[in-house]
Amino acid sequence: MFNWIKTFMLMAAITALFIVIGGMIGGRSGMMLALLFALGMNFFSYWFSDKMVLRMYNAQEVSETTAPQFYRMVQELAGRAGLPMPRVYLIDEAQPNAFATGRNPEHAAVAATTGILNILSERELRGVMAHELAHVQHRDILISTLSATMAGAISALANFAVFFGGRDEEGRPVNPIAGIAVAILAPLAASLIQMAISRAREFEADRGGAVISGDPQALASALDKIHRFAAGIPFAAAEAHPATAQMMIMNPLHGGGLANLFSTHPATEERIARLMHMAQTGTYPA
């Protein structure tokens, strides 16, 4: 229950940020329009964001006929987790990665890149897909998709404020420097909110995935491999839609410094250490 309250507050913060930017562009009228737009975005995201994200990544749905081994693996893990069978997708990308999306367990989808299938053993791949199913089980998928959609909209609105300016309550033009500051700080604030939503949920999905697969060491090994391989392979679709990066099992974006500081994912080393502790002791560190 606490996680749901925290998530609601964080989503409210994203919506409030959206309204503030609307106010900078069009005063009180801009705030009202931004509020209506934010509510519309949340409604649209609830029903359609999974389809939108899968289309962004050109994900292709597979079946037991077209990808029998992979499909049956997901089917077996979903059964172990007590979940309905999700739709299964493959993305033709060299970078090893995977994500889950959908509004609830009854309307969920899991996707993996061809790159992850190429580098992981069957045991490691089971660990990764169990991690994604843990997101479904914990109902993280709606929150991550909603926050990704809203964060992307905030960035677009902030850029609009720079290029087209805005007006205050008296109709006077907003200082262009303020507009530039909004364009820089608003996406950063949205990223911080996404980070707060995502990091704790990744640890929980690691723990939950290890329980579903019964093999925390395999997931730890998979994370190590993905981390090493992903660092040297660009992911064009993720770079084009950076707000969706927090949905992935591993941050798909390249960059250092601030990019790492504000990463939506916990440090891979810490994730591995926690899983190895679980493998050795049977308990996941708090």
Swiss-Prot record:
Annotated active site: E132
Domain of life: Bacteria
EC number of this enzyme: 3.4.24.-
Major place of residence: membrane
List of residues binding Zn(2+): H131, H135, E202
Compartments where found: Cell inner membrane
Required cofactor names: Zn(2+)
Keyword annotations from UniProtKB, A to Z: Cell inner membrane, Cell membrane, Hydrolase, Membrane, Metal-binding, Metalloprotease, Protease, Transmembrane, Transmembrane helix, Zinc
EC supergroup of this enzyme: hydrolase
Cited InterPro entries: HtpX_protease (IPR050083), Pept_M48_protease_HtpX (IPR022919), Peptidase_M48 (IPR001915)
Molecular function GO terms recorded: metalloendopeptidase activity; zinc ion binding
PROSITE patterns: ZINC_PROTEASE
GO annotation, biological process: proteolysis
Gene3D superfamilies from the UniProt entry: Metalloproteases ('zincins'), catalytic domain
Co-factor remark: Binds 1 zinc ion per subunit.
Transmembrane segments: 7-27, 29-49, 146-166, 177-197
Membrane topology: Multi-pass membrane protein
Family: Belongs to the peptidase M48B family.
Record's protein name: Protease HtpX homolog
Source organism of this protein record: Ralstonia nicotianae (strain ATCC BAA-1114 / GMI1000) (Ralstonia solanacearum)
Gene responsible for this protein: htpX
